[in-house]
Amino acid sequence: EIGGAIENPLSNPNGYKFYQANPSPSTGGNNVDARHVACWVQGMYDPNTGNRLLMIPPEEIASVRLGNQNAGSQAERITYEFDVQDDLVLLMKYAVVLENPGHGDAYDPYFGLEILQEDGTPIDSEASCGEAFFSPSKDPEKWNHYTPSLGVRFVWKDWTTIGIDLRKYKGQKVKIQLTTQDCTLGKHGGYAYFTLDCISATISSEGCDTVSLEAPSGFKYYWYNDENKDFKPTTNQSIDVLAGDTTTYYCKVTYLDKTDCNFVLSSAVIPQFPKAKFNALFKANNLAFLFFYINILI
């Protein structure tokens, strides 16, 4: 989805910015003009950050790049809408790369992220937990800087993780909307990478003696338990408990850059039951398909 008109919250709140429409949003990952690109090669770094920003964050198998480094007063948008059917927490990771012309918020390249309710209003609007807006002139001390050549300056934001508790939106539609745009004067561009995932609001684990309960990476943590008086609260990402422990542990997960934004995960320790372990071998034999199951000795 590419703009004719896309509103920029960092510019005049009473007006809109206008951009040249382009009917070709994607032209392939090897083309500098590509606007919607799937990145799946591990260990690749973005050259416009001095090869310091991973194009795929740790623990992920792929990412999507929205936008390109070309200028021309253009804009791109990706919108994803889905039905919340389970007790889920939405996890999004994003990184931003923008040229820095120093024009000011109203004219600079821009990246926006919004997570919206079914009626279009922002989720967690009071704390702004489901939105993020960036331009080079906004909070300049929070950017990383790279100047590859005379007259070209880039700012970039390393991978950041946000999480939204969707349990109260169960049965509703949720919309995720990301926007990138060039500077309005036509000479500078920008783009962003992102990944998207959902996890259960209950952390479950199984084992024989002790089990590890681990919260998602990219946050601050506070584990606590109201039932087990011997348990000492901790700020580690994970805790180890006995396999027979049936009490419920809770982890308060807080954004790194927005301390008012958090969600709480609960735990469930599941007893370990014996399971068969085998490899499957598939062969095509004339018109027949043969499957072989080979037991693995433990």
Residue ranges and their predicted role:
Residues L196-I298:
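Proline- and Ser/Thr-rich low-complexity, intrinsically disordered segments
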Residues E1-S200:
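Aromatic (Trp/Tyr/Phe) and Gly/Pro-enriched flexible surface segments
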